[in-house]
């Protein structure tokens, strides 16, 4: 039987230029580390993405959902937390929900990823939601996350990613 964790989409299987361009919209630089090298700023270790300052670190074996999750933390955190960022993104439970919601929206902007693939990968990795699945949560129970993203300027009134960082002026 195949291990579902081994089946998640990894960075080596997507257009990394498209990913870097997406991250640059938010002032975040994708920095690849060598295979088997410890990923700087990684909270969870192993192949999980890391944040340090305005850099998002990853290896080619890093899961795409991990990169998008950490990028979403960067977008959602306050300017003060962003300024001192090194490994621990912090934030409230509601902000964490907003991060999960945003990572799905960002996945839709990457040609080889998309919402459906991210739902499957988040479920396989063990993300846990009240509705039992990422899709169920996103479609039925994420009103608070959407509202948080709108209130902080990350989504516009139509629910589209604005390109702004939370707490950014203007």
Regions of interest found by a model, annotated:
Residues 13, 93-100, 112, 116:
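Short, amphipathic alpha-helical segments
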Residues 1-50, 57-61, 105, 109-110:
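Auxiliary, metal-adjacent structural segments of Zn-dependent hydrolase domains
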Residues 56-64, 91, 95:
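Secondary-structure capping and boundary motifs in well-ordered enzyme cores
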Residues 18-43, 90, 148-170:
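Amphipathic repeat-derived elements
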